[in-house]
Amino acid sequence: MAKKIQAYIKLQVKAGQANPSPPVGPALGQHGVNIMEFCKAFNARTQGQEPGLPTPVIITVYSDRSFTFETKSTPASVLLKKAAGLTSGSARPNTVKVGTVTRAQLEDIAKAKQADLTAADLDAAVRTIAGSARSMGLNVEGV
């Protein structure tokens, strides 16, 4: 018989830096999950990623207090800000442009995100990432 699902918890945790402090501790603690077990497993799974990049994670908590989790790729906005060398996007993206990204940078980001995107091919994924860049106030070259 399959385990009964008690809750889904969605968090963004920095790769390789999960610890019991907020937001991880309180979110897992209220469902009775072993926090240190999650932190060790998460840090082990994200070991190959660049440390400090936020990594979305979906934790499935079962009624017997066990859990499984699935990590996603880093959000496109974080990767775009890193590619453009920015700390934040534009407050008024339609009028104030704060940086520029090239098609090559967009392709690199699209390849990293392709598993989490609904795009049929790489070109569609690049267009999706380019739209995100424009909505952040970045100029897009070559698309």
Curated annotation (Swiss-Prot):
<dbReference type="InterPro" id="IPR020785">
    <property type="entry name" value="Ribosomal_uL11_CS"/>
</dbReference>
<dbReference type="GO" id="GO:0006412">
    <property type="term" value="P:translation"/>
</dbReference>
<dbReference type="InterPro" id="IPR000911">
    <property type="entry name" value="Ribosomal_uL11"/>
</dbReference>
<comment type="subunit">
    <text>Part of the ribosomal stalk of the 50S ribosomal subunit. Interacts with L10 and the large rRNA to form the base of the stalk. L10 forms an elongated spine to which L12 dimers bind in a sequential fashion forming a multimeric L10(L12)X complex.</text>
</comment>
<dbReference type="InterPro" id="IPR036796">
    <property type="entry name" value="Ribosomal_uL11_N_sf"/>
</dbReference>
<dbReference type="InterPro" id="IPR020784">
    <property type="entry name" value="Ribosomal_uL11_N"/>
</dbReference>
<keyword id="KW-0488">Methylation</keyword>
<dbReference type="GO" id="GO:0022625">
    <property type="term" value="C:cytosolic large ribosomal subunit"/>
</dbReference>
<dbReference type="GO" id="GO:0070180">
    <property type="term" value="F:large ribosomal subunit rRNA binding"/>
</dbReference>
<comment type="function">
    <text>Forms part of the ribosomal stalk which helps the ribosome interact with GTP-bound translation factors.</text>
</comment>
<keyword id="KW-0689">Ribosomal protein</keyword>
<dbReference type="InterPro" id="IPR020783">
    <property type="entry name" value="Ribosomal_uL11_C"/>
</dbReference>
<keyword id="KW-0694">RNA-binding</keyword>
<comment type="similarity">
    <text>Belongs to the universal ribosomal protein uL11 family.</text>
</comment>
<keyword id="KW-0687">Ribonucleoprotein</keyword>
<dbReference type="InterPro" id="IPR036769">
    <property type="entry name" value="Ribosomal_uL11_C_sf"/>
</dbReference>
<dbReference type="InterPro" id="IPR006519">
    <property type="entry name" value="Ribosomal_uL11_bac-typ"/>
</dbReference>
<dbReference type="GO" id="GO:0003735">
    <property type="term" value="F:structural constituent of ribosome"/>
</dbReference>
<dbReference type="Pfam" id="PF03946">
    <property type="entry name" value="Ribosomal_L11_N"/>
</dbReference>
<keyword id="KW-0699">rRNA-binding</keyword>
<dbReference type="Pfam" id="PF00298">
    <property type="entry name" value="Ribosomal_L11"/>
</dbReference>
<protein>
    <recommendedName>
        <fullName>Large ribosomal subunit protein uL11</fullName>
    </recommendedName>
</protein>
